[in-house]
Amino acid sequence: MSNSMHRRDFLKSMAATGTVAMTSLPVLGATIPHSLAAGCKFFTVSQAALVESISELMIPADQFPGGKTAGVVFYIDGVLAGPFGKFYRNRYEEGLLRVDAASQKQFGGCFVSQDSDRQTAILKDLQSSDAAGSPDQEFFGLLWRHIMEGYYGDPEHGGNRDGASWKMIGFEG
């Protein structure tokens, strides 16, 4: 079974439970694209790389662009940088810290440096280890919603670059 299939299975399981995961922290030894450094208003470069990594894990590229190519991280960054993002900022900062801490504990490295199988394991462990209503459950649900909004929403809000998901579903815009 390919990594793409594992990611699709993970995406389906998270959608079924209404939860998902997200992360951020130091990106040890990872190469950060210049576009992340230049394009974010709220996220640090390492946080943006983590969110981008999770968005690609949740919506992997196949014949259509994945979360990374669609620019989901820029949509989420815009939400958090805007006036209505105040309520979510602390949740993202703490949630991303927990994801990266779990990666450090399980595999001795930051989340973005792990392969997709390890990333999936980290997110599944965090999602399933807590009771309903826990901070991780709430964060994963928030992240999932924002990833979906960033992927399928209006490109003018920073995600869905070039209307990629709209083209996928045949929406003319």
Q: Residue ranges of each PLM-predicted region?
A:
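Aromatic-residue-lined binding/catalytic grooves and analogous aromatic/hydrophobic interfacial grooves
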Residues: 15
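Short, N-terminal intrinsically disordered low-complexity segments that are rich in Pro/Gly
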Residues: 40-44, 61-66, 85
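C-terminal segment of N-terminal export signals and the immediately downstream linker at the start
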Residues: 3-9, 22-58
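Short N-terminal micro-motifs specific to bacterial/archaeal maturation
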Residues: 1-2, 110
